[in-house]
């Protein structure tokens, strides 16, 4: 009887505490409602993508390399005077500078997903949502968060293996530099 109680107590503890730690995986297929993907963004909002996005706009140029790393395509992007831009995205329509997004141009592109920076674009979330546009706001601050966002981009574009590979490649590049 003591063994049974110990096993029962351990199972109960595992059940209770499994939801207490940080969520390493912020996305999941939404099987219960047949959605493509459910994402918890960096604002804590749950965003349900009913199907794989086909018309993505990035409001932060820093995310373009992540999107490019998984072979993702965009229909619009913010412009910036700093940073390298992937060649495939140089001729994509612009929706204004990162800090001055032209919402009319953005909405006119009819995106099914907007990838925004939490700090810069959180104020736009209600307007985008009222226009039935799915939007995630992210803000990776650490190396591990950057890798998590690479993996997220792979999931968004329906190629999770490319997101995992991009994160692994980043690890290899960092390792090569730090071992010198």
Question: Can you annotate each of these PLM segments?
Answer:
Residues 55-59, 98-101, 109, 116-120, ...:
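Extracytoplasmic/periplasmic, Sec-exported soluble proteins
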Residues 54, 72, 131-134:
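A short helix->loop->beta-strand "cap" motif at the edges of active sites that frequently abuts
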Residues 40-48, 95-107, 123:
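Early extracytoplasmic/lumenal segment of secretory-pathway proteins
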Residues 12-16:
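Hydrophobic core
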Residues 37-40, 44-47, 75-76, 113-116, ...:
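Extracytoplasmic/periplasmic mature domains of Sec-exported, cell-envelope-associated bacterial proteins
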Residues 45-48, 123-180:
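Extracytoplasmic substrate-binding proteins
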Residues 58-109, 113-118:
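A short, structured surface patch at a secondary-structure boundary
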Residues 2-8, 19-62, 161-180:
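Bacterial Sec-exported substrate-binding components of ABC uptake systems
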């Amino acid at each position: 009887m003591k063994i049974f109680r110990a096993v029962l107590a351990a199972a109960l503890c595992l059940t209770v505490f499994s939801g207490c730690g940080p969520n390493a995986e912020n996305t999941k297929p939404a099987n219960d409602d047949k959605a493509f993907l459910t994402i918890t963004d960096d604002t804590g909002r749950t965003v349900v993508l009913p199907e794989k996005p086909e018309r993505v706009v990035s409001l932060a140029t820093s995310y373009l390399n992540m999107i490019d790393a998984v072979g993702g395509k965009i229909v619009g992007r913010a412009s910036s005077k700093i940073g390298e831009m992937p060649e495939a995205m140089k001729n994509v329509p612009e929706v204004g500078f990162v800090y001055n997004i032209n919402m009319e141009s953005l909405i006119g592109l009819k995106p099914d997903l907007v990838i925004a920076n939490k700090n810069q674009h959180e104020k736009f979330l209600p307007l985008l949502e009222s226009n039935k546009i799915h939007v995630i706001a992210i803000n990776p601050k650490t190396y591990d968060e950057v890798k998590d966002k690479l993996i997220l981009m792979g999931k968004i574009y329906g190629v999770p293996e490319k997101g995992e590979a991009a994160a692994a490649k980043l690890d290899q590049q960092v390792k090569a530099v730090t071992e010198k």
